[in-house]
């Protein structure tokens, strides 16, 4: 998703809304012909990016409905093709693959997580599969050709009591988090706490820097409760995890996965990772 601020976005959308429908279809067709062979379900990606600026389109276009073609073209202008491994591919970490089928005796299949550094030196997480043979030789499997970005799902329902407990562990002052949480019900959504937090940050220029940092820690905690999901028809080597929250915007890296087996026999993989927002690691 390529976004350089609301003012520029409004000007760009206004120009696209001013185009006639034939021009829109012609330009969209040229874009799809050039890029559809390099990306899976590119129209889905374009529509997803359109939805992120749809509120601006509604503000600028009160009377006329926007066609599907025009929505996709708007999505094009908020999409940036990015070479995720153009600068480096390094810092591997290995964990046992849950799928150990179709192997020869003495072989073990593993999943390797890596730090991929692309244009602008923004880091993301990528994966490869490999086989370790009986002689401890590592045989890398060929990665997929297409790359799939995770869909971010923010459907977590926060419990105020538990959220406050976490903030206390983080030593966020009670007089600070009460400015946000006192406005919320006992159960609240991500959108609710984000709106309350940002309104306090953006609407109070007199807020001292130490209190502003404490308020941003509230949003950081809310951002940490995020799920991502990939399409089932993607190979593991085609999946990339980009920075998601504003506190990861300069890169996420060095994931270290560990397999845990629960008492009921089910396995789950946990990982620590490093994130950077340009100021704080």
Pin down the residues of each PLM region.
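Beta-propeller domains
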Residues: 1-281
